[in-house]
Each structure stands twice: as C-alpha cells, then as structure tokens.
C-alpha cells in the first residue's frame, strides 16, 4: 500500500528515485485519488484503490471535563485542535495567522482557545515566535512533543473540532482519528 508517491519535503533525486523504484513494482494499492494521479506519472502498473483505514486503537471518547483536567485545560473554555506531526506543509503558520486575524476582528469569542499538539518535524521556535508576536500566548496551548497513544483520546475529547489547514495533502491519518472520535473537521481545499 502506497501512502505518498511524492515526499512532502522535496529532495534533489526524488523524481529519479521514484521513476527507478516505482517502475520495478508489479502493482499498487493507493489510498487517495491524488496518490493515484501521482503514481500514473511514473508507471502503468495495475493499481487498486483502498481508502485510508480508520483508526480505532485510541479508545473511546472520554468525558470532556475529565479530558480537559488531564491536559491541564480549563473546561469552561472551548477548544479547536491542530493535531499530529507538525510539518511545514500542514499549515500551522496559516492557522496561527488566521486565528490572530479573526481574534483582532472580533470573529472568535473570548471563550475559544487553540490546542496545538504534536512533535515538530523541524525547529518549533518559528511557531513559538509567531504565537508571541501575534499576542496569542494566552490563547494557544502548544504541546510540542510526541503524543503517546493513550493520551490521544484526551485531545480529541477536549476539542470541539479539528483544524487541518494543510497546504498540500494526499490523505490524512489525523482525519481518521477525528472520525473515530466523531469530531468535526475543518480543512483547506487542497
């Protein structure tokens, strides 16, 4: 099963390697139409669609107040969630900019907060600086670390919706987790 044909962070020999490697494979199982289109640029091998599986290994939703308590959050607040490995293409910079703008325009109520939970693929300091420069220190909870499986349910149970402002995407495992926890998802059109 092929997750991505093109890597999210591009390197010099990616296309050459893909042409060589994918040309040697007899067939593929892909998880999104975007991946299928990318695959067709490299090979005519047979391909079968199988959607990204749903994750059910994180348990069931827990009481929201209890989830907030476990995360050190005020249960009187309302939370939006950005979750997962933090990589440039996932658009956290866009989300922080939009949050600051909406707050300045009075379009986000004072009860709302943003939870950013996940390990940074690169240096987290640019995100931290943006939070401070935008005056969002009191509104953004930044858990820059690996989130163990047993804690995932707390984040998805504390939040009212998941935000995925991706700049590019093929499919997202984080979306499947949101489905498991029956959490609405706001996404960009990519």
Predicted regions and their residues:
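A short, histidine- and acid-enriched strand-loop-helix "catalytic/donor-clamping" loop
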Residues: 1-12, 27
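Donor nucleotide-sugar binding/catalytic pocket of nucleotide-sugar-dependent glycosyltransferases
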Residues: 23-64
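Glycosyltransferase donor-sugar binding loop
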Residues: 54, 83, 113-126, 145
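Nucleotide-sugar donor-binding and catalytic loop/hinge architecture
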Residues: 62-79, 106-109
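Conserved donor-binding/catalytic core segment of Leloir-type glycosyltransferases
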Residues: 74-90, 96-99, 114-115
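Short donor-sugar binding/catalytic loops of nucleotide-sugar-dependent glycosyltransferases
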Residues: 83-88, 102, 119-121, 146, ...
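Nucleotide-activated donor-binding/catalytic signature segment of Leloir-type glycosyltransferases, i.e.
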Residues: 125-146, 150-153
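Acidic donor-binding loop of glycosyltransferase active sites
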Residues: 154-172, 180-183
């Amino acid at each position: 099963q092929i997750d991505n044909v093109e890597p999210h962070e591009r390197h010099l020999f990616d296309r050459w390697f893909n042409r060589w490697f994918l040309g040697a494979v007899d067939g593929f199982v892909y998880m999104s139409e975007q991946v299928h289109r990318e695959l067709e640029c490299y090979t005519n091998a047979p391909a079968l669609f199988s959607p990204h599986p749903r994750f059910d290994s994180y348990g069931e939703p827990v009481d929201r107040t209890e989830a907030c308590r476990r995360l050190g959050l005020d249960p009187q607040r309302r939370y939006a969630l950005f979750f997962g490995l933090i990589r440039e293409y996932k658009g956290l910079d866009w989300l922080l900019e939009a949050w600051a703008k909406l707050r300045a325009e009075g379009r986000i109520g004072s009860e709302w907060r943003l939870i950013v939970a996940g390990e940074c693929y690169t240096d987290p300091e640019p995100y931290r600086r943006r939070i401070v420069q935008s005056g969002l220190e009191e509104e953004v909870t930044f858990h820059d670390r690996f989130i163990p499986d047993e804690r995932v349910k707390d984040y998805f149970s504390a939040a009212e919706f998941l935000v995925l402002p991706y700049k590019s995407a093929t499919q997202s495992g984080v979306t499947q987790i949101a489905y498991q926890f029956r959490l609405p998802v706001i996404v960009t059109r990519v």
